């Protein structure tokens, strides 16, 4: 699903929620929350281009500036930590400011292409500009040994609607927009390929349910889809190139909210 379709779903969902009668038992007041869980990142189809010409050597031709490059990165399951400060209205709506952090490791890279040609089977010297040798590993063998990680930190403004069920159990849906920084470190086979960060606008869609423990506390579980509106663009250290890294992720979390003045 592309960004336009997701934004349309947000708008449609907001309109539908506005038509739901307000929960008679909803109480108004501020709250704070803390949650944690697992981050399930999508694979990243990294893409970029050389920003300078790689000179020719006796064994390999030059790689001109603006030549495309890319590869696929698969990630491990990671973790998520979130903190919220919000305000609940008596009509079922809530608004909140959320700080969100996720971190996950790199499993493997594969399918490195330069100018559209896959070079996984080529001597790694094509990238290091060293001399090819029978004992050298291939590009594919070097990048298959993942190593590295991606950390994301975001600040979001969220809007939720708690659905009144007439009990202490309340399903909810929500959406948020904000800004997210991605810190990308790629070190396949211990080679320092990338270590940089980049920020950009981001959005998230949420659904879950809460259960009241008391008048002041409630437990909640939540699913979140979070992504940026663009890729995280990071400069490469091994090559004179920039790479766009995708940061879309599902997050499954559980936490507690403490209510004040309600």
Model-derived segments and their meaning:
Residues 1-28, 261-262:
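Cleavable N-terminal export/targeting peptides
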Residues 22-87, 184, 257-262:
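Short glycine/proline- and aromatic-enriched beta-strand/turn motifs that initiate or cap beta-hairpins
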Residues 27-29, 38-42, 84-187, 247-262:
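Gram-negative (and chloroplast) outer-membrane scaffold detector with strong preference
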Residues 44-70, 110-145, 187-195, 230-245:
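Solvent-exposed loop segments that connect transmembrane elements
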Residues 65, 69-80, 147-154, 197-202, ...:
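Short sequence motifs at beta-strands and strand-loop junctions characteristic
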Residues 164-261:
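C-terminal or late-domain output modules
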């Amino acid at each position: 699903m592309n960004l336009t379709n997701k934004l349309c779903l947000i708008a449609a969902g907001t309109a539908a929620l506005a038509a739901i009668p307000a929960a008679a038992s909803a109480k108004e007041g501020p709250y704070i929350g803390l949650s944690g869980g697992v981050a399930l990142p999508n694979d990243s189809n990294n893409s970029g281009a050389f920003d300078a010409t790689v000179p020719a050597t006796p064994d390999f031709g030059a790689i001109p500036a603006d030549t495309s490059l890319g590869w696929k990165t698969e990630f491990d399951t990671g973790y998520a930590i979130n903190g919220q400060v919000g305000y609940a209205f008596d009509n079922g709506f809530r608004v909140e400011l959320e700080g969100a952090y996720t971190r996950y490791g790199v499993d493997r890279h594969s399918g490195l292409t330069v100018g559209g040609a896959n070079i996984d089977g080529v001597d790694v010297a094509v990238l290091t500009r060293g001399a090819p040798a029978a004992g050298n590993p291939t590009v594919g063998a070097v990048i298959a040994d993942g190593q590295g990680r991606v950390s994301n930190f975001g600040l979001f403004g969220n809007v939720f609607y708690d659905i009144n069920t007439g009990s202490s159990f309340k399903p909810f849906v929500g959406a948020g927009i904000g800004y997210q920084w991605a810190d990308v470190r790629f070190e396949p086979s211990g080679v320092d390929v990338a270590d940089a960060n980049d920020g950009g606008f981001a959005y998230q869609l949420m659904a879950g349910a809460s259960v009241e423990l008391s008048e002041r506390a409630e437990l909640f579980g939540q699913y979140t889809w979070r992504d940026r509106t663009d890729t995280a663009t990071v400069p490469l250290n091994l090559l004179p190139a920039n790479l766009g890294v995708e940061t879309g992720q599902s997050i499954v979390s559980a936490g507690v909210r403490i209510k004040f003045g309600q």
